[in-house]
Amino acid sequence: MAKDPGRVLIFDTTLRDGEQSPGASLNLEEKLAIAQQLARLGVDVIEAGFPFASPGDFAAVQRIAQQVGGENGPIICGLARASRGDIKACADAVAPAPKQRIHTFIATSDIHLEHKLRKSRKDVLGIVPEMVAYARSFVDDVEFSCEDAGRSDPEFLYEVIEAAISAGASTVNIPDTVGYTTPTEFGRLIEGINRNVPNIDEAVISVHGHNDLGLAVANFLEAVKSGARQLECTVNGIGERAGNAALEELVMAMHVRRRYFNPFFGRDEDSPTPLTAVRTEEITKTSRLVSNLTGMVVQPNKAIVGANAFAHESGIHQDGVLKNRLTYEIVDARTVGLTDNRISLGKLSGRSAVRARLEELGYDLSREDLDDAFARFKDLADRKREITDRDLESIVSVQVQQPDAKYQLKLVQVSCGSSLQPTATVTLADENGQEQTAASVGTGPVDAVCRSLNQLAGEPNELVEFSVKSVTEGIDAMGDVTIRLRRDGQLYSGHSAHTDVVVAAAEAFVNALNRLVAGTAGPTIHPQLDMAQLDSSPVH
């Protein structure tokens, strides 16, 4: 049997695989904020990025290793393909962390070998031990992944895993890269590895999976029963295509059904010892932070963290819950940190009180960003009677942005009505503080604002998404606007919140423009990386 740490290790890949969601690109400060909250959540491993892919990814992994990795904190991990350049860049990026891991991978399915890598099985069996050993020359903790393991020949998979462990891999990851397997199949795959890999007792079995058929969480739970002891997942289940296995669903499934899972760990059924190290009361806070910073809206009926997860519409259900919550609720909302979100902050509240509450919500702002956030808070307090945590989160998420933003919105003014042509006047300042003003007409006030901003910026783009949602209840609620722009096939998202949705739209558009400019101004590929080498993309 594989190594058993006595519980399930949670490997969070929100900052790597999660960021591969179209339009979910994060800047360095946003990644750092999420990493700090993941540490508070109690995950065991943070996969902070793919260092060789770009200078930005390298810098983010290095900064997280410096500021989040600690003796008592999570392992900081970077992803690397099975090549020396990737592995060296990864080693350099994670070096500042007291607990470091290199996660290297290569595809093992015949379809990937033939059409993507153009390599034989023999080639792969030669590459794997060489690259794992090379990674071990930098760190003691090496994880090896067999990309597309779910569609690989099991007998070949056993050979590859044995070779990786012999070369020094302490964790072997089994990815269902395209979300193809069913729970029974995936469980049998893990059982087969346990039975047929001679040295499997020297490594922890990890699993990674995508949700293309909606089975990722079910597959993982079956894998746990079969001996997997590390789960690679993302907050809110974000990720490539249909997403990844959702961290919050996995953790709470094992929390609520602990009596069911305990025997698979050799424990008494009634053992109260948690199956993960995750602090469940941090789940809601983490979910909201990731949603705010990525602009990826959580569907209302999403398990555990959706807006309706603890709502009851049916009269029969409402009656039962009022009599005893256990009649229709298997999870106490307080267990995942969901409480009354009204807070005692108002227009008389001071800067220190706001800072303290923001830190509780997972935001550690610089002095300058805190000043900006506090000014926005005071402005909102003058216009809105009650301030909630959701309001604060919406305010501050706007502040966590590129410090070298090229454009800053100075003025937005619109004129519209049932018998008027919608017109917008906007003033934009560049990085040198020079201001320019433009006016445009449009089909509506938001269209007119966007036309004016494009006229001033002169950055080619296509608006592919405009969405607005209410942050809280009430007619004085803030409107949270998300805008996505497309250029050269890449998506750039921006969002903002304001009681005036037209102003929020203007701010969100400028935020997206700044991301677009930052994303196209410099090299997106690591200087050492030959474009032809990118035939093996990190989507395992």
Curated annotation (Swiss-Prot):
GO molecular function, one term: 2-isopropylmalate synthase activity
Family membership: Belongs to the alpha-IPM synthase/homocitrate synthase family. LeuA type 1 subfamily.
Cellular localization per UniProt: Cytoplasm
Pathway annotation: Amino-acid biosynthesis; L-leucine biosynthesis; L-leucine from 3-methyl-2-oxobutanoate: step 1/4
Oligomer status and interactors: Homodimer.
Keyword Cytoplasm: yes
InterPro entries to which the protein is assigned, alphabetical: 2-IPM_HCS-like, 2-isopropylmalate_synth_dimer, AIPM/Hcit_synth_CS, Aldolase_TIM, LeuA/HCS_post-cat, LeuA_allosteric_dom_sf, LeuA_bact_synth, PYR_CT
SMART domains: LeuA_dimer
Domain of life: Bacteria
Keyword Cytoplasm: yes
HAMAP family with a match to the protein in the record: LeuA_type1
EC number: 2.3.3.13
Residues annotated as binding Mn(2+): 17, 208, 210, 244
Known function: Catalyzes the condensation of the acetyl group of acetyl-CoA with 3-methyl-2-oxobutanoate (2-ketoisovalerate) to form 3-carboxy-3-hydroxy-4-methylpentanoate (2-isopropylmalate).
Domain spans labelled Pyruvate carboxyltransferase: 8-273
Any Gene Ontology CC annotation: cytoplasm
Top EC class, one word: transferase
Reaction catalyzed: 3-methyl-2-oxobutanoate + acetyl-CoA + H2O = (2S)-2-isopropylmalate + CoA + H(+)
Region Regulatory domain: start-end pairs: 408-540
Primary localisation category: cytoplasm
Protein name: 2-isopropylmalate synthase
